[in-house]
Amino acid sequence: MKKIVFDVTIISLILFFVQSCSIDENVTTTAATVSKSSTDYIGTYLSACGENKQQAKVVITDSGTEDVATANFHKISHSDSGCSTVLKTIQYNHTARAMGDTTDDDGNSVSKIYLVTVNVTATLNSTYTSSANEDEWCGLSNWEDDTAKDVTGKDCTNSLSESFSSALIQKYDIWHLNGTSFQKSEESTEGYPTTLDGTVYTKQ
């Protein structure tokens, strides 16, 4: 129950933060410049299966707050080259708000997206859970098969090869939607990127 209350509190704080905090000088808040809302991107987008047996997924949903979406970025590792059997999934959860349009370095019309971290979760399948508990991956010893664990703010470099950001971290992104093809940049904490990262996602 405490965990549920904490998560609800974090999400409520983020929605308030997105609506009311003063954005730094890199962010344009003039509503008249916005041609797309973050909710215009609502959908599930999936990348192709990579040679490294990894796949990326972006899930954008309506947060229930005007012009604010929930944006969840999934990094999925598989055991096979066809990406049919999932070994682990890292899910980065954010609130997202479109802050205006710009043109990237390649001439694409993109939306500037202001992100705030809600949390980060890791889900392991049975291939990893025993080792994860024995070696206390991310400082946790209660991993369960196919069950998401909160790794927000944890240093997991020795197990998941990554150190995860804390909640309420502000990030900047750019999004581009062309028909059913979606692209984004690598998020930055220092200002809006100027190039898309090259991964093309297809709307499902």
Task: Please annotate each region the language model reported.
Residues E66-N72:
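N-terminal mature ectodomain segment of secretory-pathway/periplasmic proteins
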Residues K3-V5, L15-T44:
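Bacterial Sec-dependent N-terminal signal peptides
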Residues S22-E25, C49, G64, N142:
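Disulfide-rich extracellular repeat modules and their boundaries
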Residues S47-K53, N72-G179, E186-D197:
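Contiguous, well-ordered beta-strand patches that form the walls/edges
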Residues A32-K57, A96, V200-T202:
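Tryptophan-anchored aromatic micro-motifs
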Residues A56-T65, S188-Q204:
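C-terminal or late-domain output modules
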